Amino acid sequence: MKKQGFPPVIDENTEILILGSLPGDVSIRKHQYYGHPGNDFWRLLGSIIGEDLQSINYQNRLEALKRNKIGLWDVFKAGKREGNEDTKIKDEEINQFSILKDMAPNLKLVLFNGKKSGEYEPILRAMGYETKILLSSSGANRRSLKSRKSGWAEAFKR
């Protein structure tokens, strides 16, 4: 089944962009980035910016990101995938990253949430951005939350 990604959550103040792969079924139903309750994205990011992002509604989460100059987007504009596993994404269409120069002129750091999105790291690095690949926030990631928190915190240091 073909799935459509979400528009970018970025503006002219965005300095850090986190790129996922493609929204999963629950996120698509909720119309929210990282909408699956088993995904640790909001917990991990909240620990970095010092806010409890899990206890606030989605719109307030996005506002917290903007206050912290953090944007969200996905590598893929669309793709076919059964279920939620990144390894099952096929026939993907890549987003047009060239728009970042105009939409987020202050963007400096692009973080890739997991291996699948990280496969596209060379493209963003070639555009002149600092890049880092994060351990996936997915609930399917078998690494401990503590290990992922440490890796994420290190990636945000500049």
UniProtKB/Swiss-Prot annotation:
Enzyme class: hydrolase
Outcome of substituting N39A: Abolishes the glycosylase activity
GO aspect biological process, one term: DNA repair
Active site per database record: N39
EC number: 3.2.2.-
Listed SMART domains: UDG (SM00986), UreE_C (SM00987)
Gene Ontology molecular-function annotations: hypoxanthine DNA N-glycosylase activity
UniProt keywords, alphabetically: DNA damage, DNA repair, Hydrolase
Effect of D74 to A/N: Retains significant activity on the G/I substrate
Free-text function comment from the UniProt entry: Excises hypoxanthine, a deamination product of adenine, from double-stranded DNA. Acts on double-stranded DNA containing G/I, T/I, A/I and C/I base pairs, but not on single-stranded inosine-containing DNA. Also has minor xanthine DNA glycosylase activity. Lacks any detectable uracil-DNA glycosylase activity.
Family affiliation: Belongs to the uracil-DNA glycosylase (UDG) superfamily. Type 6 (HDG) family.
Protein name: Hypoxanthine DNA glycosylase
Upper classification of the organism: Archaea, Methanobacteriati, Methanobacteriota, Stenosarchaea group, Methanomicrobia
